Swiss-Prot record:
One of its GO terms (cellular component) is cytoplasm. The gene is hutI. This is Imidazolonepropionase. Zn(2+) binds at residues 81, 83, 251, 325. HAMAP family: HutI (MF_00372). Catalyzes the hydrolytic cleavage of the carbon-nitrogen bond in imidazolone-5-propanoate to yield N-formimidoyl-L-glutamate. It is the third step in the universal histidine degradation pathway. It catalyses: 4-imidazolone-5-propanoate + H2O = N-formimidoyl-L-glutamate. Fe(3+) binds at residues 81, 83, 251, 325. Its cofactor is Zn(2+); Fe(3+). It comes from Syntrophobacter fumaroxidans (strain DSM 10017 / MPOB).
Length: 424
């Protein structure tokens, strides 16, 4: 048994109401100026004002005491949308984009996702694991303690299953909690471009049953966008996914308001992601259906597009989460501190709203709200020490990470091989 007491921290944490926080509750964050956390075997047993926590335990109940030195203490980041499982970067496409070429044009030339597909298919499982682990450990050093990772660079049954095996191995062999998502409907592979409905048939009739039998995938996602998968095709995939026991996610309204957000509301998907072009009608529909909107400001920043209307989403009662969208093409970042800063400075969220978006709502967006995302009794002792007076330091101190230490299940993470971060 391991019993640890963390003292002298400025605690900021969302308050979990059992559902994603939305509307006037999006910024429900409590501040404990001198707080303490008592954890037993990695689970929080007490949290609150230091004097009150100390009054509830005896010296014999503490194996180790850690002084948080007045640092800001927040929950570990939950990154609910990543594509960290890939085999090579795409710097050459970045140069094309900054010269003005649109992403869908790059995709039409066989670049974009299709470039990553060729690389992933050619990579061995160990090569793919090593590349993925590098990015996951970078994320850990920057404060992410739970994350989702999608497949989607295989686009055939064997390659998609290989990616999911790698993602599951990442969850076993790194300290992070990893939620696998099947994204076989990420793009139409080159061999099916003349018959896209035939590829949808493959996803529905071959891939999804195989994923359900042979992988630990929790979610199924689909890229519902002009030139990729139509609303009708996306519906086929998502309904089939639900039929084999997977929860639902959808990439939609990144470039065009195609109607994927309305589909998300109709199917009561767990989340809808991107949402740069979503109509107010569909935002309201998703809010009523309890869909979490996962916003990806680093992608908008990288593509030099307008940000998703986060402020309006909060006003309409849509639960907002934020994520890195870490991928080799349009958002090559593992940094949730950077994303938090963009949420505040680019999308207009308050310090408290952005903290909820980067922690508790992200947890609910991947089915982990009961375990992580806030510092409360019964949850995993996953938290960060920040060199600042409040979480605002994440947006205020531009371009660096203020993360001093990362704790996962009350264990310090800095000793892990491969972990990186800006702070000494």
């Amino acid at each position: 048994m391991s019993r640890k007491l963390f003292r002298n921290g400025r605690i900021f944490t969302p308050t979990d109401r059992g559902v994603p926080l939305a509307g006037k509750h999006q910024g429900d964050v409590i501040h404990i100026p001198r707080g303490a956390i008592y954890a037993k075997d990695g689970v929080i047993e007490a949290v609150g004002d230091e004097r009150e926590v100390l009054a509830g335990i005896s010296a014999g109940q503490v194996d180790e005491e850690i002084d948080c030195r007045g640092y800001c203490v927040i929950p570990g980041f939950v990154d609910p949308h990543t594509h960290m499982c890939f085999a090579k970067t795409r710097e050459e496409e970045f140069l094309l984009r900054i010269e003005g070429m649109e992403y869908l044009e790059i995709l039409g030339r066989g670049g974009g996702i299709l470039s990553s597909v060729r690389a992933a298919r050619a990579a061995t499982e160990d090569e793919l694991f090593a590349f993925t682990r590098k990015h996951v450990m970078t994320a850990l050093g920057l404060g992410t303690t739970t994350l989702e990772i999608k497949s989607g660079y295989g686009l055939d049954t064997e390659s998609e299953l290989r990616m999911l095996r790698v993602i599951e191995r990442i969850g076993r062999e790194t300290p992070l909690d990893v939620v696998p998502t099947f994204l076989g409907a990420h793009a139409i592979p080159e061999e099916h471009v003349a018959h896209p409905d035939g590829y949808v048939d493959l996803v529905v009739h071959e891939m999804l049953p195989a994923v359900a039998r042979h992988s630990g995938a929790v979610f199924c996602d689909v890229f519902c966008e002009a030139g990729v998968f139509s609303v009708a095709q996306s519906r086929r995939v998502l309904e089939a996914a639900r039929g084999v026991g997977l929860e639902l996610k959808i990439h939609t309204d990144e470039v065009h308001d195609l109607g994927g957000s309305a589909l998300a509301a109709e199917l009561r998907a767990t989340s809808a992601e991107h949402l740069l072009r979503t109509s107010e009608t569909n935002l309201r529909a998703m809010a009523e259906a309890g869909v979490v909107g996962i916003l990806l400001p680093a992608t908008a920043y990288s593509l030099r597009r307008r940000y998703a209307p986060a402020r309006r989403m909060v006003e309409l009662g849509l639960p907002v989460a934020v994520a890195t969208d870490c991928n080799p093409g349009t958002a090559y970042t593992e940094s949730m501190p950077f994303v938090y800063g963009l949420a505040v400075l680019g999308m207009g969220l308050s310090m408290q709203e952005a903290l909820v978006a980067a922690t508790l709502n992200g947890a609910y967006a991947i089915g982990q709200g009961g375990r992580v995302g806030s510092l409360e009794v019964g949850k995993s002792a996953d938290f960060l020490l920040l060199d600042g007076k409040s979480p605002a330091i994440l947006a205020y101190h531009i371009g660096v990470s203020p993360v001093v230490e990362v704790y996962k299940q009350a264990n310090p993470m800095r000793q892990w091989e491969g972990i990186t971060g800006d702070h000494p």
